[in-house]
Structures are given as C-alpha cells and as structure tokens.
C-alpha cells in the first residue's frame, strides 16, 4: 500500500515542485486549497515513480479519489499501484480532476476498463488575466458601466492590500454574508473553517489578497494563490451587497494588482448554480478547465458498456455517465450466450403520480444473438419481479421509429401512450417520450 502523508505546511515546496511547472489549471492543485480544505477532504499526498499523487475523501467521506498524477511523462505505469491502494481500502480506483490529456492517457493505456464523466458544475472558469484587468471592448461595456456607477456613488472608495490587520473585518463580513445564505449551512461552515485556516497561515500559504473600502467600511475582500507558474486561482471573493458593484470593482482591481507573470486567472466552478453560472459566463472565460472523473469498471460493467454500445450506438460519454451514476448489478437482468453477456435490461425505481414505479430501461440484445428469445426471457423475469415487489406501475419507452416494439411489449401487458419524462435529481435524462405503461 502506498504511504500517503497528510498535507502539511512544510510540504508546500515539495508539492509545488510538481504543480507549478505542470501547466494544469485545476484549482484543486493549488496548495492553499489542499491545505485549507483538509478538514473536509482529508488531503494526503505521495510521490510515486516521479509523480505527485493527491488523495482525497469524496462523496461525504464515503469514498476516496485520486487526483490525476502530476509529473513529467506518462503516468500509465503507476495506475496499477493506485488500483492496489484503492483495493486495500476496500474500494475501486477513482481518478478525479482529469484533464482531456489525462483521460486520453488512461484510454490508451487501459482501453475499455474505465468509465469517464465530466460534471459541468465542477469545471473551472479560466480567464485571460488581461481581460479581467482591462475589461476592454464592447462585450465588457456592462461591467465598465457597473464600475462607473459604483465610483460615482462611492467616491471615497479605495483599494487596499489584504493584510493580517484586516482579517478580523473580513471574517465579520463573511459572517454577515453567511446569514443571508443559511440554507446551505454545512457547506458555508466548512468554507468559514477553510477561510480561518487561510488567515492563520496567510504568508506561509503564498496567499495574495485585496480589499475595497468605502470610507472606513469594508465593502469587499478577496484572496487566492498560484495554481501553476502562470495561473492564479481566486479562492474567495466576498462583498457587502449593500454596495452595488462591489463584486465587479474588486474583481477588476484585484486582477490589476496581481503580479504580471499571471496570464490566466481561475475563478473556480459554479457548482451548478444558475445565478453563479451566469455571473461567471458574463466575464467571458478563455476556456473551461475540464475535470473528468474516471472509475475502474468491474467486469460486468465492462460487459454492460460493450453491449450498450453495440445495441444502441449511443456515444461513449452517455454510456459512461449511466454506468457511473446509476448502474447496479442488483437492478440489471442479463442473459448469457457463448460465455458472454448477450442481453440485458435495467429496472430503475422512480416515484411518479401513479406511486412507486419501475422504469424498464436499456432493453438490449447483442445483434449476434437476436432471434433467440433472450429479450422475451428477460421481460418475463422483469414483470415477475415487479409484481412480486408490489409496484404501482411499470413504464418503458419503445425506441422511436421501431413500431414493432409496441407489439412486442404488448405481449407483456404494456399498452397506451402516456407523456412522461424520467429525469433524476441530477438531471440525467433517461428518456422523454410517450411511454407505454402497465
């Protein structure tokens, strides 16, 4: 098992020896983020075969994830070591924060053994630093107008460097801001603890910050640190909403006061919040830093994916997303032929206006084994299980354009068209169409 060590202040030089020249813009690689959020994610690190590997606890501490290894060359040879470490903790290997290149490396080294997914809500917004410093051109006119209104209304405003004597005021402003967002108490308390840790070790963490004052009153503050040699990451930005335009002006002035070596500014993710997404898009990012997650699939998941791709022709990303989020061997019925998975279907539980409902999803037969009655065999078993559970209804959506499927499913009691949409809480679309139901 790999010897991982908790991230400590004295580890900064070793960790940044890998991250600074990497060119990777992922905010999770900022040493200050690793250290300040350690109470939540239990960040740990190890050097393996010339690479830095960061290990986190994810999903509320239920699972562990490994960041994309950072170093020179191909990290493929250390994947077996990471897999062994994960297995020693009773888990499958999960790699998070993968760049496009990192994903492609894994696909090349171990094809068909990993499923990949990129969550739009977790992608970092990365901007050209000069765009934020200057706000030049027509597309930034609304931002300039906002700043002009602020400076006209508050002519006594001033920008100051964030120094230790101002930390108390910043925490007081953060507490007031938190009162207005009490619906997310646990997340905000964790952020407050991370801020407190940042202020306790501001200089040692290499943090840089700025403040806006109106008279003697703190209107906004922000701080961050380097992700790599040319990318700065804004970790925190808070403002008193009584001062309209405070967020806009501190964004610009802070960018102007950063060292010129920073040509990119990472303003982190939007967490899927519509208002935050629109605000970040309004500054016109140069690009979004993808952060793919990958899981090492079990043999039955590999077989499910292979059959899915053969039968439906969906893109690989869709199949991977389904497997990573919703696949369960307990909810999948299969038929085998010649030593491999030849047919399958999935029984997905939903709550609808009809009550407890099973959605029969992904009914598929390998083209090489069609005409043998395998799908009929699985449908009979599915209907038996649904009846045994006492579900109130069962739905399925026949593949559009294949009218013969209506007659096929009719043999099992499905009839009628009911407009239905099966979308999960995380917005995964299982199908929107007229459904047959029983």
State where each predicted segment sits.
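Conserved acetyl-CoA-binding loop-helix of GNAT-fold acetyltransferases
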Residues: 74-84, 243-256, 365, 371-384
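Conserved active-site alpha-helix within GNAT-family acetyltransferase domains
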Residues: 103-116, 271-288, 376, 388-392, ...
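Conserved GNAT acetyl-CoA-binding A-motif
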Residues: 89-99, 260-268, 379, 386-399
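Short amphipathic alpha-helix that is part of the acyltransferase structural core
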Residues: 1-27, 136-194, 295-342, 347, ...
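Conserved beta-strand in the GNAT
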Residues: 45, 49-57, 211, 216-226, ...
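Conserved catalytic-core motifs of GNAT/GCN5-like acyltransferases
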Residues: 117-125, 286-297, 397, 410-431
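A short, internal acetyl-CoA/4′-phosphopantetheine-binding micro-motif in the GNAT/acyltransferase core
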Residues: 66-74, 235-244, 360-371
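A short helix-loop-beta-strand connector motif used in the catalytic cores of GNAT acetyltransferases and
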Residues: 24-27, 32-51, 200-210, 323-337, ...
